[in-house]
Amino acid sequence: MRKLVSSVAAASLLSGCGGDLAGARSILDKDELVVAVKSDQPGLAVRTSGGVFQGFDVDVAAYVAARLGKKVSFVATTSEGREAKLREGAADMVVATYSISAERKRQVTFAGPYYVSRQDILVRAGYGGIRNVRDLKGRRLCEAQGSISTSRIVDGHRIAAVLVPARTYGECVDLLRSGAVEAVSTGDLILAGFAVRERGAFAIVNAPFTAERYGIALPLGDVEGCEQVNRAITDMYQDGTAARLLDKWFGASGLQLSAFVPEFEGCTP
């Protein structure tokens, strides 16, 4: 199945951008799906120097598109740009570590989740000052634009961290490396990807405290498309593809990775 996923993704890059994105009622009416993914999250989605997107999210999107009988191509997005990609017709789906929330469900229709990640904390290797979420009080914590991870700490857990803004999690990691921040906190898959890439420069605290349910976002109201995507996600777990992809991209991180079908949100508001 890995060969199928890779070949679908490769073929998609030669097929252009898929034409009119806003004219169809549902993604099921399209011959080709344009999928927005991140471009700077190691293990999840990066764009190589040759312009090729690769990573877990990319492979998930390619698998889903293949199950729907669609060609697929990819465009880059940032956390703050995800809703706009769908609203403006620049993408048909968003697969970009997009945590499902009540507020976001008012703007997009979520299929999935395709993975339930646990929020954790990334620090510089050897730094023992942060062992759990409570230790973030008074610490400099990076806040990536468009992410709700820091809100879960400051508002949900009422921990008075000192937030330092950055545009992306890649920038957050740069700030962590330089010492401008003391921690980065978000879903463990995001943190694991950076930890593997940096080869020992950073460490995951391994004190998870909040679940992050990563959904596949569709244009608001596409219930039929959402239901079909959920069937594809179920197939991905039941045929072993999800387990293989998780091991492929994150096996070296040491994280305990779930290979069970996540409980879906439901496609209607």
Spans of model-derived segments:
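Extended ligand-binding regions for polar small-molecule ligands
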Residues: G18, V58-R67, Y127, R134, ...
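Extracytoplasmic small-molecule ligand-binding "clamshell" domains
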Residues: G19-T97
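Bilobed "Venus flytrap"/periplasmic-binding protein-like clamshell domains
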Residues: V34-P42, G51-R67, Y98-S99, R118-E171, ...
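Periplasmic-binding protein-like
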Residues: S39, Y115-V123, A192, V196-T234, ...
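Acidic, polar ligand-binding/catalytic clefts
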Residues: A62, K71-D135
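Short helix-initiation/N-cap motifs at beta->coil->alpha
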Residues: F74-A84, G128-G129, V164-S178, E212
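A ligand-binding cleft/hinge motif common to bilobed small-molecule-binding domains
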Residues: G81-A84, T97-R106, V154, R177-S178, ...
